[in-house]
Regions:
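Conserved Radical SAM active-site core
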Residues: 2-156, 160-165, 195, 200-202
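Structural recognition of alpha->loop->beta junctions
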Residues: 100-109, 113-114, 176-183, 307-310
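Residue-level signature of tetratricopeptide-repeat
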Residues: 285-286
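Short, basic-rich loop-to-helix N-cap that marks the start of a DNA-contacting helix
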Residues: 289-294
């Protein structure tokens, strides 16, 4: 995947970004024909298979988006490229540009960066949360619902720790985005202060915090958890010591142990160490014969050492089986 900027050296002043206005980087840009030709050369040499295209804002949002669309259009129309193109939608782009992006791209995205307008104002004062970020995301969501854009959908990104937000705020924004904006994925980026930016003196955000957000996100998207079930502490933070699924299980002893041979697939995926695929395999496996030992858990793809304290195998605690392995 070629990840590239159409232009560097931005007109906006997001406090965390190395490309911010007045930053130390050298401003440069590529014309659509230049970038399209360079990508095709890499494609022909089999060094890349797809394009992830973003840009710093140069000459205004509309002109910047036009250059990006120009690159994508050359690849599709002139060079006949049918592979993966991910287009970042520049905040401030016109609705017709968003429509054009959906006709050209496999996936589109606009970065929320923060969970609310108040948080965004602290870190990206030049961006308008509702008009420039949420509005185009709603436009894409409407197209998805109408069946006009059904490829890889849209994604977004949240910066972690830049605006004093809580983990609950971030996960609340993600849950809302999955529900209302038809998001395919939310990505989380732990703030790592860049020299020469207003946040240069801050401590970097631990990557474990980012990791816990991703784990909680998976619980929302793939494990049937609601936002209210994510185990935040009293301050709205996720534990850095224990993963959220295990912590939820520890906080709900009334739900465990689960009998693997009788539990629904929905209950199995809530067991620490059992994911959607391994839960499905266990359901299929037990149709042929009872699941009686940890070897069967391992065969199904479950992390049996993690799952064992939370399950019964044919009526017996799985912990007793551990001595055999």
């Amino acid at each position: 995947m070629l990840k590239v900027l159409q232009a560097s050296g931005c007109e906006r002043s997001c406090i965390y970004c190395v490309e911010r206005c007045g930053g130390q980087g050298r401003a440069t840009s590529l014309e659509p024909a230049q970038l399209a030709s360079a990508f095709v050369a890499l494609l022909r040499s089999r060094r890349v298979t797809g394009l992830f295209l973003s840009s710093a804002i140069r000459g205004g949002a509309v002109a910047t988006m036009d250059r990006m669309l120009g690159t994508a259009e050359l690849l599709r129309r002139l060079h006949g490229f049918r592979g993966y193109i991910h287009l970042k939608m520049i905040p401030g782009s016109r609705p017709d540009q968003i429509e054009q992006a959906m006709t050209l791209a496999t996936r589109v995205s606009v970065n929320m960066e923060a969970p609310s307008a108040a948080h965004l104002a602290q870190i990206a004062p030049g961006k308008k949360f509702d008009a420039q970020i949420i509005a185009p995301m709603r436009q894409v969501a409407a197209a998805i619902r109408q069946g006009r854009f059904a490829r890889a959908g849209q994604t977004t990104q949240l910066v972690v720790g830049a605006s004093g937000e809580r983990d609950r705020d971030l996960m609340g924004a993600a849950a809302w985005g999955y529900r209302e904006l038809k998001l395919a994925r939310v990505y989380y980026s732990a703030l790592q202060p860049v020299p020469g930016t207003p946040v240069a003196g801050r401590a970097p955000i631990p990557f474990m915090r980012e990791h816990r957000l991703y784990q909680s996100d998976f619980l929302l998207r793939s494990y049937g958890f609601s936002l209210d079930e994510i185990p935040f502490d009293a301050t709205g933070s996720l534990s850095l010591d224990t993963d959220p699924k295990t912590l939820w299980a520890q906080q709900h002893p009334e739900r465990f142990p689960v009998e693997v041979n009788q539990a629904s697939q929905a209950d199995l995926v809530r067991v620490p160490g059992i994911g959607p695929r391994s839960a499905q395999r266990l359901v299929v496996m037990r149709r042929e014969h009872p699941v009686r030992d940890v070897a069967a858990l391992r065969e199904a793809g479950a992390s049996w050492k993690i799952a064992s304290p939370f399950v019964l195998l044919d009526g017996k605690p799985a912990l007793r089986q551990l001595r055999l392995f």
